């Protein structure tokens, strides 16, 4: 094999010629590391292997017997504060100097040696702009730090749920997920990276805090001098004791779904001529999964998958499955002769939106309905769920299911890691968040396709004895039957995206001042206060405490108003207001949620003085 060496006086791990812009249509850039006077192996514009003719076959390519490791000097870079959703910034930030390389090395500096030395790690992402280049950077630094094996999805593709599934199935020590979730992608937009542990769940704060601390003191990056890996073909490449296996991104995840659900039952529903199905992959990662699962295995029509090709910029769209950003799907579902069931997933495949014909299912209702029907409709839960949980802002619909089924119930802060602890302790089976995240203990991430298959299972179970020509039990029928049994929790969320951080934070501080003066019995218009607080949670598994998780006003009739700032964007702050009102009267269940909630919405805007603090007249998104 011919090696190419280049000497740089000052070079960067991801460098660009001054003033030049990278196009995915141009040759891939070489990868180097910031240092001075050090020879660094780079890969020019060519494949270094000609290995596999068929992507479905597997091959082993041997490199050198050993690899050379370089210790390259670097300096701390500001702005690498890491949360459980990882690190998210504009992609241009990650492409500067050693920004990504510093964070990856800081991660290895934060992990116990046994968690990565000679270990197996998984690598994949949602296919957004910069993922392929970042994959090469991560692989070389992993090899430089003594990792034994990297399992990487073909073309760098692995949905977040699939990463969790692969980690668990292959008993890997952890995995990197390259994604900014539902945030836009492309040269001008967002990129992100996070690390999941051996259970498949996001790294805890003890690790993310260490990562941030190490980014402030980092002085060197350990990098292996190996060529770029060909990610376009399934196969194994070895360099000494280090190997990279490019894996099919779908197979392990599909196998898990076949274990969880009755595919024959679902296939029977999707094969009916009187049942219409539509899935919008939003040009995001689930496009790689939709055809193999829904079409090839479950018999859905090929044209039932829309926006099914993953694109680096998500087709110039915003891959957030809600009524605003999934408008194409919504328009189809609200036609007179629209499909019976529609769903969408987000950038990295962990969120979902469910629709019936002219009917939207709120995420809060969705998880409650799945839980109420799981034992009958889903083989994985045949023995019954172990427990149920929701994030604090999510409506109380799930609480009532837990009460009726006599199941343990948990209310946790926003963040999937809180569910993971309960799952690992055997206390939790089904959980969800109002932010279109639903899942179970089959993995340790929320799972968009799992939620779609759960709903298809419920509909298939309800319609298994429905004869051709008879009316099918619809999505709306299932939801309204649930409301009649448990009552309806009217729920809405107002998102004000990319607000000035200063004004948004001042608004939250103002609300906390109100909390300090509030007491039970205070009157807010037609509502009487039961209590007001800043939500705090003590984990029943490890005793850890999460405080300041959302300002909430809870009234005596069960109504709630909640205020939170979201940190999942790459710029500014997103103010979220959650409004909920319980209605037991069946005759009032068909009222539009925005009408039913208007008095509470007006109260929330008045109490918070949102317009004064943020200058915003209207929300960016209403859910």
From Swiss-Prot:
GO cellular component: apoplast; chloroplast; chloroplast envelope; chloroplast stroma; cytosol; stromule
Matches recorded under Gene3D superfamilies: Alpha-D-Glucose-1,6-Bisphosphate, subunit A, domain 3, Alpha-D-phosphohexomutase, C-terminal domain
Signal sequence coordinates: none
Active-site residues per Swiss-Prot or TrEMBL entry: 181
Transit peptide (first-last residue): 1-63
This enzyme's EC code(s): 5.4.2.2
Pfam families to which the protein is assigned, alphabetical: PGM1_C_vert_fung, PGM_PMM_I, PGM_PMM_II, PGM_PMM_III
Phenotype of null mutants: Reduced oil content in seeds. Absence of starch granules in both the hypocotyl endodermis and the root columella associated with reduced hypocotyl negative gravitropism but normal phototropism, leading to axillary branches with wider branch angles.
Residues modified to Phosphoserine: 181
Cofactor note: Binds 1 Mg(2+) ion per subunit.
Residues binding Mg(2+), per UniProt: 181, 346, 348, 350
Principal cellular location given in the protein's record: plastid
Described function: Catalyzes the reversible isomerization of alpha-D-glucose 1-phosphate to alpha-D-glucose 6-phosphate. The mechanism proceeds via the intermediate compound alpha-D-glucose 1,6-bisphosphate. This enzyme participates in both the breakdown and synthesis of glucose. Factor that affects seed oil content. Accumulated starch in young embryos may play an important role in providing carbon resources for seed storage lipid biosynthesis in oilseed plants.
PANTHER family: PHOSPHOGLUCOMUTASE, CHLOROPLASTIC, PHOSPHOHEXOMUTASE FAMILY MEMBER
Family statement: Belongs to the phosphohexose mutase family.
Protein name, per record: Phosphoglucomutase, chloroplastic
Taxonomic source organism: Arabidopsis thaliana (Mouse-ear cress)
């Amino acid at each position: 094999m011919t090696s190419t060496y280049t000497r740089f006086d000052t070079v960067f791990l991801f460098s660009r010629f001054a003033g030049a812009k990278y196009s995915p249509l141009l040759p891939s850039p070489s990868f180097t590391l910031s240092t001075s006077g050090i020879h660094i192996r780079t890969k020019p514009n060519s494949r270094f292997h000609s290995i596999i003719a068929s992507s479905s076959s597997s091959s082993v390519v041997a490199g050198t017997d050993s690899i050379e490791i370089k210790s390259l000097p670097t300096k701390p870079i500001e702005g690498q504060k890491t949360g459980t959703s990882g690190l998210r910034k504009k992609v241009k930030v990650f492409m500067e100097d050693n920004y990504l390389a510093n964070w990856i090395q800081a991660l290895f500096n934060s992990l116990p040696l046994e968690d990565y030395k000679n270990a197996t790690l998984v690598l994949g992402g949602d296919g957004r702009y910069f993922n392929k280049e970042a994959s090469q950077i991560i692989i070389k630094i992993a090899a430089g730090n003594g990792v034994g094996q990297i399992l990487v999805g073909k073309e760098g593709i692995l949905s977040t749920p699939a990463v969790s599934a692969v980690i668990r199935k292959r008993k890997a020590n952890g995995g990197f997920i390259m994604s900014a979730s539902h945030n836009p992608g492309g040269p001008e937009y967002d990129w992100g990276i996070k690390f999941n542990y051996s259970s498949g769940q996001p790294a805890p704060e003890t690790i993310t805090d260490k990562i941030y601390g190490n980014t402030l003191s980092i002085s060197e990056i350990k990098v292996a001098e190996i060529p770029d890996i060909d990610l376009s073909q399934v196969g194994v490449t070895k360099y000494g004791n280090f190997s990279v296996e490019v894996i099919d991104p779908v197979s392990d995840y599909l196998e898990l779904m076949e274990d969880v659900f009755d595919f024959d039952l679902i296939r029977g529903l999707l094969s009916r001529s009187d049942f219409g199905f539509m899935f919008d992959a939003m040009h995001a990662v689930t496009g790689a999964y939709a055809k193999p699962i829904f079409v090839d295995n479950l018999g859905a029509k090929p044209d039932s998958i829309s926006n099914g090709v993953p694109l680096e910029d998500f087709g110039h769209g915003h891959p957030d499955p809600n009524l605003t950003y999934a408008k194409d799907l919504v328009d189809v579902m609200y036609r007179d002769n629209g499909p019976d069931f529609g769903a969408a997933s987000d950038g990295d495949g962990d969120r979902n939106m469910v629709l019936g014909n002219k009917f939207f299912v709120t995420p809060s209702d969705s998880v409650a309905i799945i839980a109420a029907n799981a034992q009958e409709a889903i083989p994985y839960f045949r023995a019954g769920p172990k427990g149920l949980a929701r994030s604090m802002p999510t409506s109380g619909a799930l609480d009532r299911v837990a009460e009726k089924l006599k199941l343990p119930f948990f209310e946790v802060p926003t963040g999937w890691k809180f569910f993971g602890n309960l799952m690992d302790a055997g206390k939790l089976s089904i959980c969800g968040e109002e932010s279109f995240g639903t899942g179970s203990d089959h993995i340790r991430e929320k799972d968009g396709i799992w939620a779609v298959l759960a709903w298809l299972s419920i509909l298939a179970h309800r319609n298994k004895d429905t004869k051709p020509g008879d009316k099918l039990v619809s999505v709306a029928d299932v939801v309204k039957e649930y409301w009649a049994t448990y009552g309806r929790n009217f729920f809405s969320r107002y998102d004000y995206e990319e607000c000035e951080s200063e004004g948004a934070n001042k608004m939250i501080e103002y609300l906390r001042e109100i909390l300090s003066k509030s007491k039970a019995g205070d009157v807010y218009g037609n509502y009487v206060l039961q209590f007001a607080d800043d939500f705090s949670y003590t984990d029943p598994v490890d005793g850890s405490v999460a405080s300041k998780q959302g300002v909430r006003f809870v009234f005596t009739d069960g109504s709630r108003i909640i205020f939170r700032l979201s940190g999942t964007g790459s710029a500014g702050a997103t103010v979220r207001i959650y409004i909920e009102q319980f209605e037991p009267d069946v005759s009032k269940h068909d009222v539009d949620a925005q009408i039913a909630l208007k008095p509470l919405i007006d109260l929330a805007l008045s109490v918070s003085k949102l317009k004064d603090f943020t200058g915003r007249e209207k929300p960016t998104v209403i859910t």
